[in-house]
Amino acid sequence: MKEIIYTPNAPAPVGPYSQATRANGFVLTAGQLGIDPATSKLVGSDIAAQTRQALSNIRAIVGAAGRTADDIVKVTIYVTHLSLFHEVNAAYAAFFADQGVSAPPARAIAEVAALPLGALVEIEAIAAI
């Protein structure tokens, strides 16, 4: 059985999907852009700021499911320019360190041709229950 997870502390879905689904011992988030949930706008034109906001959105969604950043076991990151990997990596490392996570989760990163709203990064996560 699945349960839909929703929080107003992350951007509302812009299509026919949920912020996250809890099923079979996991919370699986939808891809998150660097959108500020208060304004529904991208937070900036740089990938570091968008990465921080996307991760903040994931933290809010995982939190709505009663989990923390330490429960995240897998992250997938999509970027429009793999040349910006180091900026994403720095923001990612800082996020998990700020959350008190000593061993960040497994991760994959892939370059894509484009993302919605002209975003530079999209991040999805899986957390264990």
PLM regions and their residue ranges:
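N-terminal presequence-like segments and the immediate start of the first folded domain
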Residues: 1-56, 60-74, 79-129
